[in-house]
Amino acid sequence: KRIWKKALLLVQFVATGFLVTMLVFVARQYTFMVNDRPGYAYENLAYCGLAGVDSTSRAKILDEVMRLPGVAAATTVYQLPFEHASGNNILLPGGTQELFNIADLYWVGNGYLDMMEIPVIQGRSFTENVTNSREVMVDRRFVEKMKLVAGWTDDVVGKDICVTEHSKWNEEPFTICGVYENIRLGGISNQDMRPSVLFYAHKPMYTLQVKFHELTNDNMARLQQKISETFPDRELSAISFRSEIMDLYKDSRQFRDSVMIGGLVTLLVTLIGLIGYTNDEVSRRRKEIAVRRVNGATLWDILRLFIKDIGYICIYAVILGGGIAYFVLQKWQ
C-alpha cells in the first residue's frame, strides 16, 4: 500500500512539473508574440472599415477626424498589414514571363509610411496629391528577389516593373520611387514571407487609419463618436491596432489559460495527495517518532525523516515532467 501511494505521488509530481514547465514556456512565448515589433509602430494606431461608404463621404470623415483633438495624423488605406494580403505577379516591361508572386498591399494615402514609422531605406516616398500615380514602392525582400531572378543590383529606384491586375497586360509599367524596410504581414505564426509592394491613391480608400499622440479611452471615444455622427445609419466601429494584433494570438492565449488552469488543479491535487501521504506516514511511524522525541530529537529532525523519504521522489518527478514538457514543446513549435 505504501509503494502504491508513492507511485501515485510520483505521477502527480510528474504532472505538476510538466504543466508548470509548459505554462512558463507558453506564457513567455505569448508575451513575446504580443510585444514583438512587426516593423511598424502600432501602439497609437486605430482604424475603421469604410466598406460601402462612397468616396465623398470617405473624404469627409477623413477631414473631420484630422481635426479631432489628440489626433496626430489620419489617412486611408486599402489593406492593413495584419490582414491576409492578396497576391499579384511581377513582370518586366515588354516581357511575358511572370517572375514571382508578391503580397499586394494595394493603395495607401498621404503620409502612410510616416504614420506607420516604416523607414524608407532607398529613394523616397510617394509624390502625393497626384490623381493617377504611376509610382510603386517595394520592400527590401523585393530588391533581394529581383537580384536573384532578374539580375538587378541593389539600386532599384527609377526602374520600371509591371504588376498583374495593375498593369493591364503589361502595357502600363510602374516606376519604383523608393524601397521601405520589411514589415511583418500577418502574425508571427502565419507570417507572409512574400515580397510586398505599395501603390499610392489620392482618392480615399476603404479603411480609415488614425494615429493618436496617445491612444487613450477618451481619444477612442471621440473618434467613435465622430464616426457615428457622420454615418448615423451605419454601424461602423473604431478598433485599435493593438487589440487586433493581440487577437491574432488568441489561440496561444487560450492555450496558456488552459495550461494555467490545468496546472493549478494538478498542483492542488498534488498538495492534497502529499498531505494525505504525510498523515498516513505519521500514523504508521507514530511509535518511531515517539521514541525519537524521548531520545531528544527536535521537530526539524522529525521533519527531515519525511523530507528524505519523499524529497528525492519529488525532485526526480519534477525534472522528468519538465523534460517531457520540453520535448512536447519542441514538437509543438
Where are these regions (language model features)?
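Membrane-proximal extracellular/periplasmic loop immediately following the first transmembrane helix
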Residues: 27-100, 104-107
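Small-residue-rich transmembrane alpha-helices
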Residues: 18, 28, 308-333
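Intracellular coupling helices
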Residues: 1, 272-313
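Short juxtamembrane loops and helix-capping segments at transmembrane helix boundaries
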Residues: 1, 33-41, 298, 321-333
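Beta-strand-rich non-transmembrane domains
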Residues: 99-102, 114, 124-138, 158-182, ...
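"Rare, low-scoring activations can occur
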Residues: 55-56, 60-74, 140, 144, ...
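Hydrophobic alpha-helical transmembrane segments of multi-pass inner-membrane transport and secretion
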Residues: 4-29, 253-287, 315-316
